Amino acid sequence: MIATRILRRPRVLIVGCGDVGMRCVEQLRRRARPPRIIALTSQPARRAELLAAGAVPIVGDLDRRGTLARLGGLARLVLHLAPPRPSGDGDARTRALIAALGARPAARRGPARQATQAVGRLRATASHLPDGQANRAARIVPEGLRRPMTLVYASTSGVYGDCGGAYVDETRPVRPANARAVRRVSAERQLRRAGARGALDARIVRIPGIYAANRLPIARLERGTPALVDADDVYTNHIHADDLAGILLAAARRGRAGRVVHASDDTEMKMGEYFERVARASGRASPPRITRDEAEQRLEPVQLSFMRESRRLVNTRLKRELRFVLRYPSVEDFLRTVSADSELGSLR
């Protein structure tokens, strides 16, 4: 009885539980039968915050493999939201996570250990039964214990590089144009190889620019950072943070092994237009416009890197395969819910 009760409550491990991860926690907690949520954090000071949100914190650092020993066999669903290190050609963090998840789990104590032992006894008994009875006994073992774990990886649409404003679906070959995107491609390939070995069932979600009330370019507008003139401007793609959390969970539930899905809304606008719409909604001045040549002289390399890539993501898989309904189909839909005299107007 104890084993059945425990095995019926699945565990979800969130690796990299920042803003989007916390939104995933909130959405999981709202389910009629919420899972047990475990959050890996490298910051001991965040334990109280995670507990208050409804997650069990585990302190560990993807840059220190020795701190990850508890992850082996811990959960059947993993949300991998941690970014790569800010340097290097590959993603050592994803490599460390795959190794930790595939390690033999430490002996469980208490009810969890009893559950594992109960399943083991059931399997041992089934091995001595006639074929028909053995098959029926095997079906009693929860399906999650017979399949590899599911891992949903939060990647980036930056892996495509510059596409000249073309419409891009998930079948387009990756052509990363900067070191950040190269590291993301490394992570995706590591997860695909792990999937081919049967170590896990990876679903890859490629994410564009994330926005929310607390993630808008307000500081950029107040600094007066310029945008490109329309003739030189690039198409950008967007997703609200709440929708993104929902998409990650939908990928876990309905996604296909090894499949890529774009987490992008229906917005079709250039970068400068995005800044102008946020400026109007928040009661701030529109950014000045400059040519690309002027931008190359005046802006920082990181800012320029985003201005060198133009693409329009196709989100057909999101709607057809994941059957996901966007809460905010476009940036404009979100901005219409706020005004300059409400929360946006007070942001700094």
Q: Residue spans of the language-model regions?
A:
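Amphipathic terminal alpha-helices
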Residues: 329-348
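Conserved Rossmann-fold NAD(P)-dependent oxidoreductase catalytic core, especially the SDR/UDP-sugar
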Residues: 99-122, 126-179
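Catalytic helix-loop patch of NAD(P)-dependent Rossmann-fold dehydrogenases
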Residues: 164-204
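NAD(P)H-binding glycine-rich loop region in Rossmannoid oxidoreductase-like domains
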Residues: 42-102, 111-116, 120, 125-132, ...
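Glycine/proline-rich active-site loop of Rossmann-fold NAD(P)-dependent oxidoreductases
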Residues: 185, 197-198, 210-222, 250-261, ...
